[in-house]
Swiss-Prot record:
GO terms for cellular component: extracellular region. One of its GO terms (biological process) is cell wall modification. CDD domains: PMEI-like_4 (cd15799). Its EC number is 3.1.1.11. This is Pectinesterase 1. The PMEI region may act as an autoinhibitory domain and prevent untimely PME activity during transport. The lineage of its organism: Eukaryota, Viridiplantae, Streptophyta, Embryophyta, Tracheophyta. Pathway: Glycan metabolism; pectin degradation; 2-dehydro-3-deoxy-D-gluconate from pectin: step 1/5.
Amino acid sequence: MANPQQPLLIKTHKQNPIISFKILSFVITLFVALFLVAPYQVEIKHSNLCKTAQDSQLCLSYVSDLISNEIVTTESDGHSILMKFLVNYVHQMNNAIPVVRKMKNQINDIRQHGALTDCLELLDQSVDFASDSIAAIDKRSRSEHANAQSWLSGVLTNHVTCLDELDSFTKAMINGTNLEELISRAKVALAMLASLTTQDEDVFMTVLGKMPSWVSSMDRKLMESSGKDIIANAVVAQDGTGDYQTLAEAVAAAPDKSKTRYVIYVKRGTYKENVEVASNKMNLMIVGDGMYATTITGSLNVVDGSTTFRSATLAAVGQGFILQDICIQNTAGPAKDQAVALRVGADMSVINRCRIDAYQDTLYAHSQRQFYRDSYVTGTVDFIFGNAAVVFQKCQLVARKPGKYQQNMVTAQGRTDPNQATGTSIQFCNIIASSDLEPVLKEFPTYLGRPWKEYSRTVVMESYLGGLINPAGWAEWDGDFALKTLYYGEFMNNGPGAGTSKRVKWPGYHVITDPAKAMPFTVAKLIQGGSWLRSTGVAYVDGLYD
């Protein structure tokens, strides 16, 4: 115990106040210098990592945060920084999920309840995509970078889809999930990956003479066969002669995360049901007796309370999905606005010899790499839309008679960031009018597309364009929105609607004359087809000139 007469603090010698002030000033100056120099050093060292970001300062601030929190060091390379950034990002998305789930349980509005249900599904998918991207980036190869770019493009698309479906009230409520920040971080991740990829070479590997490489030799044989000749794992038949009477039952019974092809054969007939192939239903093939014999039909639509995302008659997000010899339709009609027949968010998916029928928003090519061959798609407004990396070859794209005062738009592509590896490519196809539109072409103009999002990207090449196509070719979405940032191109088309002399004069529109500029939109380039399509057995052309 201290002596009660002894002061608790020992008395020190009195210091010169001028010297003390100088020492204090030096310490403060040193601290400020270090505080200012550290971010500057981060900016200099890692500026290349953020060079393709739309907001490079935001990107650098994220890197600085990782360093400040000792997650990475100033000496860490770009791959390591990106992987740690994504680990943090996955953690943020996982934290957002229970917040959205709680909000969904509290909200009474049917449409917003549905929108939050969609957001939950999309967040779950995004966690998987980002986690898979970390593993792919760690391998440091061009092909794995291409995979990561596709998956991270899907993450950004998922977040934007969620935000698009929410009304202003729900957006305010959901602010606790920092959805806008999740979007910003997805864009930064794509920018970082793009900077690493350009150092290692272009992600789009040219592999000529092959199908998209995600198609195995066994799948190739399956796709060369008809449904009745395939030895299926499960058979669906309305008359009870199969294993199941509905497709939904057969899909539910399919194995989860299958590493081998699982085939469901659907016998001829019309099946009134809505079917979802979830992300855990991998390598699933659904095959019918032909696009005019086996039909899956539904009628969900936005007017009656569904979200666009959930209105699909058939939705598929399980990787490696194949759909063949079947018709998918939504019969809601033009008065019901958005009513999707088929939604696909399955990476490395193939739609072969199928018919997809509806009016507005017929085919939602939502995200990931997709290939459509020898198929027949009908619709009116934005009837092929979404933000997938998708190639159509030898398809019939048929515009129908729309509702009163409507205009037909073949495409509405939804790319929101220049680093997304997404776009719509239409090659060796016929774009024509249906029999009910043909007599009234002058009343209902038809355009090749309009920009749904800021960096919309669509190319039509080596295709037949019927007389239904308006001479302007393309239409605005809203005034001058996206006209400078979109990329719309036409290359070597033919037919009465193919003339380009009266086409729009937008900065983002291009009449392509150099084949090298058309190559990025081929199977080999846009969807890395050389690495996966060959094994499916579906016919395809990987380059130009059929």
